[in-house]
Regions:
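Hydrophobic, aromatic-enriched interface-forming segments
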Residues: 165, 169, 176-178, 184-202
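Short, flexible coil/linker elements and helix-boundary hinge sites characteristic
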Residues: 185, 211-213, 284
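Low-complexity, glycine/alanine/valine/leucine- and proline-rich hydrophobic stretches
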Residues: 192-273
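Long, charge-rich, low-complexity alpha-helical segments
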Residues: 1-180, 253, 258-315
Length: 315
């Protein structure tokens, strides 16, 4: 009678021994794959793996049990810690997006986002960097408000960029003396973010902030407590489409938003792209109006304000 063939051994999820840096990297990848899988609705690590195997079987290849916890339970601690931390970080970073979608839909959106674009940085600061792209790629999570949510994700990421990007020595009026406008190239501060939006999300964000500050404010009597609770529960009305140009900037470590005239936006964007001052002005002002006295006064006012805000820098 022919000998029965043994079934093929199951491929290991993680290396059995760590004898090299390659083995260590494989073990780390296996652990990351396990703990970064989304939690169940009960906030537990799934009991079954994608191929139907018990997750405990895979966990045993990564972590040893101890006298208190199984291998599965030990890894579940890391999984829950990871998911609670990254979800909480995005929750705090995206108040406008959360207000526009409502908390249940927002939580589903960011979980789906983290599955496709998990953290790849040592800092949580970079976690929302690809959220606007994801909203465009997967509109099913934000319909029928995808365009608004895309603007909000861009705006809220811009605020993060502004907060800790570099600030260079400012460009002063003295630096303009004897300069030829045809050759002069100004530089904008690295932290300055210029946004062309389809919705007035700057006003929406401010309304959300005011609502949240009222709901968090300390109340000293029953009437104030009641008012704070009503404010917290109140929804901020989603804005209607309106072409909007905004500069997000900072002064003394505080972030500000400044509305821009479309022509002012075009001038600043041209400067940001490395155009000369003359080219930037041509890009911003229609040829038929570039000698109009009103436009000259308007442009002078813009540049005076931008200089006062320290938007131009030396490089």
């Amino acid at each position: 009678m022919p000998a029965q063939r043994k079934p093929p051994a199951k491929k290991r999820f993680a290396p059995e021994h760590v004898r090299s840096t390659a083995d260590l990297a494989a073990l780390q990848r296996a652990m990351w794959t396990l703990i970064s899988r989304p939690l169940t609705p009960a906030n537990r690590m799934p009991r079954r793996w994608r191929d139907g195997r018990p997750t405990a079987e895979l966990a045993a290849q990564i972590a040893k049990p101890n006298d208190r916890l199984t291998s599965f339970e030990r890894l579940e601690i890391y999984s829950r810690m990871y998911w609670f931390r990254v979800l909480d970080s995005l929750y705090e970073d995206c108040p406008g997006l959360r207000a526009a979608l409502g908390q249940p839909r927002f939580m589903k959106l960011i979980e789906a986002y983290l599955v496709k674009y998990p953290s790849r940085s040592f800092t949580l600061r970079n976690l929302p960097s690809r959220l606007a792209r994801f909203i465009r790629e997967k509109p099913q999570w934000t319909r029928p408000h995808t365009a608004l949510c895309h603007d909000l994700a861009r705006f809220e990421w811009a605020r993060i960029e502004v907060f800790d990007s570099a600030a260079l020595p400012v460009f002063t009026v003295d630096d303009l003396l004897d300069a030829n406008p045809a050759r002069l190239k100004l530089n904008l501060q690295p932290y300055l973010q210029l946004l062309q939006l389809d919705y007035p999300v700057d006003e929406f964000i401010l309304a959300v902030k005011q609502r949240d500050e009222l709901s968090r404010g300390e109340a000293s009597n029953t009437a104030l407590v009641h008012a704070a609770r009503k404010a917290s529960a109140r929804k901020v009305t989603r804005p209607k489409p309106e072409p909007t140009h905004v500069a997000v900037h900072r002064m003394n470590s505080t972030i500000y938003f400044k509305r821009l005239d479309p022509a002012a936006y075009r001038i600043l964007r041209a400067i940001q792209r490395g155009k000369s001052l003359e080219q930037a002005l041509s890009a911003g002002i229609p040829a038929a109006k570039n000698s109009d006295g009103d436009w000259v006064a308007k442009i002078q006012g813009w540049f005076r304000t931008w200089m006062e805000l320290g938007w131009f820098c030396q490089r």
